[in-house]
Amino acid sequence: MNRFRKMVTVVTALFAMQAAMAQDDVQITFDKLPAKAQSFVKTHFPKEEVASVWKDIEIEMLRVEDYTVALSNGTKVEFLPNGEWKEIKSRGSEIPASIIPSGIRDYVKKHYASSTIKDIKKKRYGYEVELTGDIDLEFNSKGKFLRVDD
């Protein structure tokens, strides 16, 4: 009987631990973001209020994968664990020009003057940019145009 109780206790503990670890998105406060990410938000979105901040934890590795900051205007900014931004998604408002590399800004202004950048994502090769009108463009790390992504 004693052995049965131990087995039940162990199984119950394992289920409880698994349930606790299954939550991989944890809401945190703004001050828990890496300092570099806090500075980025304050610099480029000074008039926007922070609606929520989330930390995404990789369950298997027990490490932080990224942070997501949702702003009052609907914009979401994803950061790497070191505080570098990796993606910015705008919902109705324009992404601040101060964030976008000048080569990308100039190319979009010249070739897609009536469009605005609604998403920008850092990739290994450079940047992926989505314009209003669902046009996807790719640029190298220096902001030089590579191709239209179909």
Model-based region annotation:
Residues 1-25, 41:
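Bacterial Sec-dependent N-terminal signal peptides
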Residues 23-150:
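Interaction-mediating elements
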